[in-house]
């Protein structure tokens, strides 16, 4: 409240008490600034580089070089949103915050002139362009971090940008416009609240460490249990005690299980090395996980359809959304670190019941052929066929598996098929899809990175029934009947289903409970480095199409 009052008073002095500036003087100086952009492709105000060098000339030329930020309330709204940038994991310094504050203070002392006012107007416009763009798209370009990124950025025309900007200025709705730039979905707003909470915890000293040592088990006594209670109390609330704070009683066990669940650990109630490691992750690291997750959401969630599927890679879960609300979820297995499941978006168009599996060349060369050489009956045991490029079957007794192998190998439909009873296809260049698996026991593991990159689904027939529920003649009974027939059957979806394969290591559920996941593919570090680095970005001359 005090900061807002100071800014308001400063702006009042700036607008109404500062030395008068004639329109002609300001317009001429602004014209020279715009000419500099045209001549050099860049502009610096003081020590602050201007990013929106393609948008700014069009804006000011269209206004005959008149200043924009000349009405009470506009600057306060912009500064308020920039001041809230840390809630989004962003840095106010990226938006000229201190440079603007300094110039406003100077103006309030009556020490400013026409040139300073023009430069302040440019800084404010550039700050607006920066914060609007980064709230919507993120600070970093994901294509610089992930070579297989396929979610495109769509921009509106210059005229749309300027019309929206000027409309927000005219209607006094600048703050609302900027707030609407951020993703309007619960998963984002919940993380914003969690980030505020964790920053407050950090300011209060964070949480205590739990000393390493032997596995702590329910019923035991140890001085470390007292430390454990203190640590859990910070994030999970006070842990009841029966009178002995060093006793690992039932209340401690239940608190440990809740913590393990939230951190994707084996929920056994024991405090072993993995649990101690998770308990002792510094709060600053957890804050960075939230910041990285917010940035990823800004990259992804634009123009999201009402119905879609999210495969949460780091969380090992698949979610089906109806009307943008979670409708169904199941556990999944994802790629091993050296077979990392990629992040991308595509459209699911069909599914196959009782699929065959044509073994990919890499797996064929590294795993299948060596297994055949070791065991002549391997093909029969695995229900596999040797095939030509046209799909016709070759008698394996005529094949020299120790020499050059010009064929493929296909696993036929059946209970032992690596793809199980169904696969879900969303054509993509990475050959990734959802499928059933005979390896059901692995779903009981807390960390489930076991596949070669595709996504194994725990309850695939339930998913098939949900996707086909509006397709005439395809109820669950028919699905089961086709599966029992062991006959390969392709079923086309009436409407394509958007599929997102996403990766984030922090998430908050509808009850406000945050969960942290292991960064299994070591992807967070580059994002945090980029968020902490100086702003290095040229804003586009267009605004995101979804803000038109």
Give the positions of each predicted feature.
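Cationic-aromatic interfacial patches
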Residues: 23-158, 162
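Positively charged n-region of N-terminal signal peptides that target proteins for export
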Residues: 1-5
